[in-house]
């Protein structure tokens, strides 16, 4: 009824990819695909902690995509899961992942390089850190800078456009965000689907899911 010809499951946990493809198979007529979630997996964080080179990590990411049968990579709160487990409610791009000694920026930068070097057709699909928090527009701007000119897609940007000005410490950062997006031609975005009726949230953003 909505006219979709293609749908993409944007958060496939590689370990569950077989089940995802079985469920997608039950959807008739339209084209289907999935994006493999990376950026909080222990193996990748351990590789970065041990300073494995880019080729080593590229091989791991290629192996993950081949075996999950996914179209591309999705990064959700890069490194933020480990921080959340320890009680944190915010995790910015230059914060360090507990126990691993690497920043969220380093994780994002490394996966972005892999996406380009492996010539994955879909740009790196990113769910920025600090979704829904006042002042998170700074995190979104830092994320765009971290791409360093490489192609990157920011998902549901309406939730990253919050500044922290005004009496209540909450304001629109939409102008700052749109100026940066327009200036950086490597960046694409989607606004994010808004449903105006009761919804059920199922998200790999464990902080937001926890608070929902």
Identify the role of each PLM range.
Residues 19-22, 47, 138-143:
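A short acidic, amphipathic alpha-helical/loop segment
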Residues 1, 36-58, 99:
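Active-site mouth loops of central-metabolism enzymes
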